[in-house]
Amino acid sequence: MASPKDFISPVNSGQKLVYPFRNYLNYLHDKYSDLQTGKIADYIPELALAAPQWFGISVITTDGQIFEVGDCQQTFTVQSISKAFVFGLALEDHGREYVNSKVGVEPTGEAFNSIILDEKTNRPYNPMVNAGAIATTDLITGQNATERLKRILEMFKRYTGRDHEINVPVFLSEKSTGNRNRAMAYLMLNFGMVSDKIEETLDLYCQQCAILVHAHDLALMAATLANGGVNPITGIRAIDEHYVQDVISVMLTCGMYDASGEWAYRVGLPAKSGVGGGITAVVPHQLGIGTFSPLLDEKGNSIRGVKICQNISEDFGLHLFNVAKPERDLKTWLEGNS
């Protein structure tokens, strides 16, 4: 099997140069396709129907180049990845100060579904855990539940350039097993962190988690954030540029469940994962990464997805705090692909 070193230089193929980034992604896909460790999420019954061999990698640059390999059009439910983008919509609806009065931005070190609030402020710790995400969803404005859901779906369309559907069986499955989320919501209601529209907000939260996406969508959503909030394919603004830093800051510190510290240390990119098997990762000003594989580690993160992002970050020196000159120049690898 080839290694990244085999792709260091462009190859002269007839009259044009074929650059290696597409081959590099093929190499990574081949390398990790046989990785069968991990477990498909089954605490939501419908999620257990995913096939373990599904595996896709998509990379989209801020100038609109697309590089993909594997099952990049296989749909799955977005799950917790929705939290980052709904957080951005709440910021647009209410502004930074008000949103931060309801939801903090501190990592917890606890499981994503922990029933725990900040003892001093009674806020959920951050928008990426379930309690914080429920509080964030509660902030989405609209005259009724239908309008609020429509606004979330329209927001997704701005990021991806296409209409999205909800997987109704997954929504109903999550709703029927959602007593823990209901307990969180009522605890927050007791402290005035959410409105009294508990059942409406919980339904909306379960619906946003059941939105169908694929790896291409996740790469484009990340590329949109990397591009200052403007979709690099459609040119449509998906989020006010002033709130992009809020979203990706919390993704960096809290986006990978209780493995977020390890992720920030080893990968160093703003990212969000979901138990459906997706990961979206942002390389500011450069590109977005979207991966899909439903085999999860004990933290709830896609094992193959984590490996892919770690490889790309290390091989091209993309860690946000990297100060060493990378061995490979990303721009050279990206240009000239066909």
Curated annotation (Swiss-Prot):
It comes from Microcystis aeruginosa (strain NIES-843 / IAM M-2473). This is Glutaminase. The keyword Cell inner membrane does not apply. It is an enzyme of class 3 (hydrolase). HAMAP family: Glutaminase. It catalyses: L-glutamine + H2O = L-glutamate + NH4(+). Belongs to the glutaminase family. Pfam families: Glutaminase. SUPFAM superfamilies: beta-lactamase/transpeptidase-like (SSF56601). Homotetramer. InterPro entries: Beta-lactam/transpept-like, Glutaminase. Substrate binds at S80, N130, E174, N181, Y205, Y257, V275. Keywords: Hydrolase. GO terms for molecular function: glutaminase activity. The keyword Hydrolase applies.
